[in-house]
């Protein structure tokens, strides 16, 4: 089936919302226009701020809210509130925007409201770093201690996959991967959101094979595309990165358009409309195959993670489940390599990967090769 996880933006509202109403779209009500508005306590009005109120990173169109205001807390977390309403209508969970800017106790209230609809309802947070060592507001955050987020967006894995696919040394990539695997509680690791692109990053193919923007202006970014004679190599590198994200711990996610090789630097170029006229299809079948493999092999469903080799051009790791084990060998170099997996010599093509799966039961010894 399909589950819908909503994006919950609870650290700020729009200035043009009925709650703030700076532009007067909703009459004379709203916190900005009416000092007696029921929403007035949601915001911090003070002449010291630009525009006379505290706003998200100084953007006056995004006034910040006071999450600890009782009225606001009830609006989001109370009976008939935002979370209760949407989960009651069938949503499967929430992704919290800028989770590191939400107080821990507010996240705990959100969790309680989410889990009131069932323990299977998901609460995932936007955290760009290792969520177990993240510090914000002068203290160590407690996201993954069992009373906050179920999991976070896995930017560390994304950064590792991009680096490896670009051809960077595998040793640092292996260290980054294992740091997350060792630091995260297993339930949080198993449902971490693995991705190559988001609405806040360059698209994966651009990050991997495009010319770095290096602060260049939007006009330059709007015109810059990967040359046609490099597209084949770019798509191959993107598939290498996705092979990592589909076989590492966590849940792989494909940002719309990645499956047809859509390019784009950061906002707004990474948020372009889906290109319905695209004839690019070379990633669709391999990505579908990776998805089928992941569903068919229990090693990828909560199996243990062991790094076998991370050196120069080679990243080799093993996943072990109850019924099956898998060995994944990735090669970001220009030469064919040979490695041992399940006791057998295995070739991996330049810029390619090989996934071997073996049944753990003695009576079913054998393996099949994916790539």
Label each residue range with its predicted role.
Residues 11-12, 17, 21, 27, ...:
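Active-site-proximal helices and loops of the catalytic beta/alpha 8
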Residues 53-69, 88-91, 204-207, 214-229, ...:
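Short glycine/proline-rich turn/loop motifs
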Residues 1-89, 110-116:
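Substrate-binding/active-site clefts of carbohydrate-active enzymes
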């Amino acid at each position: 089936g399909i589950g819908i996880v909503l994006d919950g933006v609870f650290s700020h509202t729009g200035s043009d919302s009925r709650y703030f109403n700076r532009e007067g779209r909703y009459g004379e009500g709203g916190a900005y226009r009416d000092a007696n508005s029921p929403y007035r306590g949601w915001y911090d009005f003070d002449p010291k701020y630009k525009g006379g109120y505290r706003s998200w990173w100084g953007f006056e169109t995004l006034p910040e809210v006071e999450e600890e205001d009782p009225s606001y807390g009830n609006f989001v977390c109370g009976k008939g509130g935002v979370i209760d309403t949407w989960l009651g209508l069938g949503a499967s969970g929430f992704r919290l925007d800028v989770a590191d800017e939400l107080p821990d106790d507010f996240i705990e209230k959100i969790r309680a409201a989410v889990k009131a609809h069932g323990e299977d309802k998901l609460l995932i947070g936007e955290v760009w770093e290792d969520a177990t060592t993240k510090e914000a507001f002068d203290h160590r955050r407690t996201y993954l201690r069992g009373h906050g987020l179920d999991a976070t967006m896995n930017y560390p894995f994304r950064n590792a996959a991009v680096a490896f696919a670009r051809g960077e040394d595998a040793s640092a990539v292996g260290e980054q991967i294992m740091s997350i695997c060792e630091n995260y509680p297993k339930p949080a690791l198993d449902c971490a959101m693995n991705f190559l692109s988001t609405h806040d990053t360059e698209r994966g193919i651009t990050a991997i094979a495009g010319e770095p923007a290096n602060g260049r202006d939007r006009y330059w970014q709007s015109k810059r595309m990967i040359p046609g004679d490099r597209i084949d190599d770019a798509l191959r590198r993107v598939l290498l990165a996705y092979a990592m994200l589909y076989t590492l711990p966590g849940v792989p996610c494909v940002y719309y358009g990645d499956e047809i090789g859509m390019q784009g630097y950061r906002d707004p170029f990474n948020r372009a409309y889906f290109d319905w006229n695209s004839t690019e299809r070379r990633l669709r079948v391999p990505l579908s195959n990776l998805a089928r493999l992941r569903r068919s092999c229990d090693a990828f469903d909560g199996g243990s993670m062991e790094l076998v080799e991370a050196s120069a051009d080679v990243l080799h790791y093993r996943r072990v489940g109850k019924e099956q084990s898998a060995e994944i060998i990735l090669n970001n170099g220009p030469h064919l390599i040979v490695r041992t997996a399940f006791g057998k010599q295995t070739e991996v093509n330049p810029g390619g990967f090989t996934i071997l799966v073996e049944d753990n039961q003695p009576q079913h010894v054998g393996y099949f090769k994916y790539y």
